[in-house]
């Protein structure tokens, strides 16, 4: 109320010039809705469309509509360093392609089936795939993943479950997506630091129990536990790599 809108724009112009940028925006907390809608507000400029180059992978998004999860950078790089040559992958929570694109570009996955419900994220993923020239190796399954994953039962060598705070609701579907010979699961969870060891055991036992119930009993083993970041005081974002044979 102390300055006019014109004066405010002049201030943003000065700041933009000092930073050598063309646009400015304000980042508020990510919405808590199912879509995790972006709360970015443009201060200078009208378009929120950006391209991000991370670890040799190009991402596209409109920052006013979807978020870019910068805190998971180490995990994106780790996944991108895994050799997935010849593998069929199901990404149960694809978003804008945080892990889908590294798996296609860096890991050399043969094909990724990406499940996503948010139209804005799907647009971003499609554009990102084109930027990386991998659109022919990507199939987007739009809608609720508990339904769309049924389209790829018994096809996958690997299933990625990258959602927080818990991916538990998709564990059964993920097992069903694995080939009859088995495969690997990447399970993201938020866990209290002092309970990580117990939770890893619980997770492994639960996957083994579900596999048996589904008539897919086999050898279930934990291959790796990655501590990605602190999510909150005492709460870790972890990824459990599980092999099902």
Stretches found by the model and what they are:
Residues 1-245:
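SAM-dependent transferase fold signal centered on methyltransferase-like domains
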């Amino acid at each position: 109320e102390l300055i006019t809108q014109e004066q405010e724009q002049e201030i943003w112009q000065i700041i933009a010039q000092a930073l050598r940028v063309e646009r400015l925006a304000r980042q508020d907390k990510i919405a808590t809705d199912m879509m995790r809608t972006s709360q970015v507000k443009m201060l200078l400029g009208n378009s929120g469309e950006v391209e991000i180059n991370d670890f040799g992978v190009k991402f596209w998004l409109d920052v006013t509509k979807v978020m870019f999860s910068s805190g998971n950078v180490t995990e994106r790089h780790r996944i991108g360093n895994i050799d997935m040559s010849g593998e069929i992958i199901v990404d149960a929570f694809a978003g804008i392609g945080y892990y889908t694109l590294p798996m296609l570009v860096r890991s050399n996955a043969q094909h990724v089936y990406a499940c996503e419900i948010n139209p804005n994220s799907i647009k971003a993923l499609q554009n990102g795939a084109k930027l990386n020239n991998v659109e022919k190796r990507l199939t987007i399954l739009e809608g609720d993943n508990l339904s769309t994953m049924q389209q790829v039962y018994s096809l996958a060598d690997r299933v990625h479950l990258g959602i927080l705070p818990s991916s538990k609701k998709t564990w059964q579907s993920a097992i069903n997506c694995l080939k009859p010979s088995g495969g690997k699961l990447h399970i993201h969870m938020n866990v209290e630091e002092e309970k990580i060891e117990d939770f890893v055991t619980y997770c492994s036992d639960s996957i083994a129990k579900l596999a048996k119930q589904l008539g897919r009993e086999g050898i279930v083993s934990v291959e790796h536990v990655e501590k990605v970041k602190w999510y909150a005081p005492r709460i870790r974002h972890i990824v459990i790599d599980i092999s099902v044979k």
